[in-house]
Amino acid sequence: RLPEPELMVDPAQVLAYAAADFSGGDQRTLDRIEALLRSDSGRAASDPAVILDLGCGPGNISLPLAKRFPESQVIGVDGSPAMLQVARDRADQQGLSIDLRCSTLQDLALEPVDLIVSNSLLHHLHEPGLLWGLTRELAAPGCRVLHRDLRRPAALAEVHRLQQLHCFDAPAVLIQDFCASLVAAFTPEEVQQQLALAGLDGLTVEMEDDRYLVVSGLVD
């Protein structure tokens, strides 16, 4: 594993990321969140009062959640001011109410929340235990959790194959970012070990398609 910078602050990188079409993956994340918010009986559970999106970036997940749950408080947190500005502009354009905060995981102070999500955050972290500790700390009783991220291939040849398959015609900055992110990502086994150390026994790890993993479940 080769870690990459924790924050995306370079203007060219921020603009390229914000302009990229991640709608397919974003929708899969939103669909999983919707399913997670249903009770065991299949009936829709009550809407979460407070939703926390960690590493929210330009709002790809936060903004649809704010639209889907207009009575909920949606809090988007990111350490990059440039990313948050994109999210603010989009929220204004869409007329959405959302609480956007610039903070690192280390400095984040919040009251307990009812739903914690992140999309492509984990691989940025040099200390992944921060995410799991914060998840446990901020989870209200019965909090639902969903973290979706890339998973690291076993060999560099597989990194190249995935790049050719999924972003062969992307801008150079996105190709570089995609490859660096794959190499920086964790394996499902590593994430399972992280969850065990954090005492998050109610969360499970599963693989999604050819390059993602999903951590989800309930925190009692």
Model-based region annotation:
Residues 1-16:
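N-terminal, positively charged/glycine-rich alpha-helical extensions of SAM-dependent methyltransferases
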Residues 23-47:
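Conserved alpha-helix/loop element of class I SAM-dependent methyltransferases that forms part
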Residues 47-57:
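Conserved class I S-adenosyl-L-methionine
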Residues 52, 60-106:
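Class I SAM-dependent methyltransferase SAM/SAH-binding core
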Residues 117:
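A conserved beta-strand element that flanks and buttresses the S-adenosyl-L-methionine
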Residues 125-135:
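A short, conserved alpha-helix within the catalytic core of class I
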Residues 142-149:
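Conserved beta-strand signature within the Rossmann-like core of class I S-adenosyl-L-methionine
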Residues 150-198, 204-206:
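C-terminal alpha-helical "lid/dimerization" subdomain adjacent to the S-adenosyl-L-methionine
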